């Protein structure tokens, strides 16, 4: 049983504030939810279980029970998950406010302990102070958190997470902020709480406290396409697809790291909750994570033999050729932008090969083929540049004054001609490695200019940022027929 979940279940009965704040989906009647996919910790109830995607950010961090409330750590409504979420620079005062909130919602004193013991002793087998009956009293106050970095903003979701060594397939990693606060001071707070417990429970409380307060922070993870809803990934190849998300909001915005102080004034907190509502946003999929997913999918279907062929059609329109025909039934080719990039890259590469190598047919086996498979994924800059360099070397460049050149005197299509003029100012007769890098990047940047893209989608924006973008109608970046250059 998850300690935090149990604590919320029992403590929500002690007063009106707790009844509202500690209400978790996992402790209520179960409702159907999307199929679970990843193992990890639910940010809402802190239990380790199978996770489903969040309706607010499309990442996997909700269990199938908590998903019914649709709470996200990026909401503006001050529910418990939001009040436990801190952002960027966390100060000692911020952590003091968090500890005060814990003491307000999960107090341990003689009156509370006696109340729980009396309500638990309903049967002979419950007379002993066994941990399974008093799990809710064994939640220490720690500064344990799950952290994530989203385009320069670091979020810390504090809570009590059991079984830290269990499998974690989410983009969140454990962080310990006790050094920002004070170890001895936090020890004293927990020892005071522990002193009210029966002796039989004190040792278990101490073990839990020290195991969750003295660990070393993990290395922060990189967010990838695997961490987002499968439904979003499946629809990425539709250029007009928009991600639909919902956020729990209030009319007033407060200091992000100061949200945990709201429980100090109960009447003001309830007045604030009266303005709570759900806002709906339609979000573009444009970001580096999703762009790289598209380019990687296209890379799996590359037919490198086209660069030595004599086909008069573009690379994606070749039919009935054993070595050059691609399977257009794959979803990745539904995005005309990917097809444009593929056609122009291979038209340019074929012109390079035909200008510098004596190869007459696509059935020939050439060393250059093994390096062409990585020419689309420009998001992996180091790997991409290595591939382009190897292709350049396969063309047997001529060195003049310490600079290597290759010929460029084969015909190319009008799209490539226009891009040549835009990138190098003319249609050249000779090219250096740097020229080729610039031209190939220009072909890809025409449709997916990753230089000006966020790493993660705008679904990971806070509500305030989403509202600002919606005012300027910028949550949807561009119509599907207009390129990044245009």
From Swiss-Prot:
GO molecular function terms listed in the Swiss-Prot or TrEMBL record: metal ion binding; RNA binding
Stretches the record annotates as RNA-binding: 1-81
Annotated region (Important for cytoskeleton localization), positions in chain: 82-176
Pfam families: Rota_NS53
Segments for region (Interaction with host IRF3): 317-486
Compartments (UniProt record): Host cytoplasm, Host cytoskeleton
Biological processes per GO annotation: symbiont-mediated suppression of host cytoplasmic pattern recognition receptor signaling pathway via inhibition of IRF3 activity; symbiont-mediated suppression of host cytoplasmic pattern recognition receptor signaling pathway via inhibition of IRF7 activity; symbiont-mediated suppression of host NF-kappaB cascade
Entry keyword set: Host cytoplasm, Host cytoskeleton, Host-virus interaction, Inhibition of host innate immune response by virus, Inhibition of host IRF3 by virus, Inhibition of host IRF7 by virus, Inhibition of host NF-kappa-B by virus, Inhibition of host RLR pathway by virus, Interferon antiviral system evasion, Metal-binding, Phosphoprotein, RNA-binding, Viral immunoevasion
Motif stretch (IKBKB-like degron (ILD) motif): 479-483
GO-annotated cellular components: host cell cytoplasm; host cytoskeleton
Domain of life: Viruses
InterPro entries: Rotavirus_NSP1
Modifications the protein undergoes after translation, according to the UniProt entry: The C-terminal region is phosphorylated by host CKII/CSNK2A1. Phosphorylation of the DSGXS motif is essential for host NF-kappa-B inhibition.
Region (Zinc-binding domain): 42-79
Entry keyword ATP-binding: no
Chain positions of motif pLxIS motif: 480-483
Domain notes: The integrity of the zinc-binding domain in NSP1 is important for degradation of host IRF3. The pLxIS motif targets host IRF3 for degradation; however phosphorylation of NSP1 pLxIS motif is not required for its activity.
HAMAP family for this protein: ROTA_NSP1 (MF_04088)
Its biological purpose: Plays a role in the inhibition of host innate immunity by inducing the degradation of key host factors required to activate interferon production such as IRF3, IRF5 or IRF7. Associates with components of cullin RING ligases (CRLs) including CUL1 or CUL3, which are essential multisubunit ubiquitination complexes, to modulate their activities. Recognizes the host NF-kappa-B regulator BTRC through the presence of a DSGXS motif in the C-terminal substrate recognition domain.
Record-stated family: Belongs to the rotavirus NSP1 family.
Assembly behavior: Interacts (via C-terminus) with host IRF3; this interaction leads to IRF3 degradation. Interacts with host IRF7; this interaction leads to IRF7 degradation. Interacts with host CUL1 and CUL3. Interacts with host BTRC.
Official protein name in the record: Non-structural protein 1
Provenance organism: Rotavirus A (strain RVA/Human/United Kingdom/ST3/1975/G4P2A[6]) (RV-A)
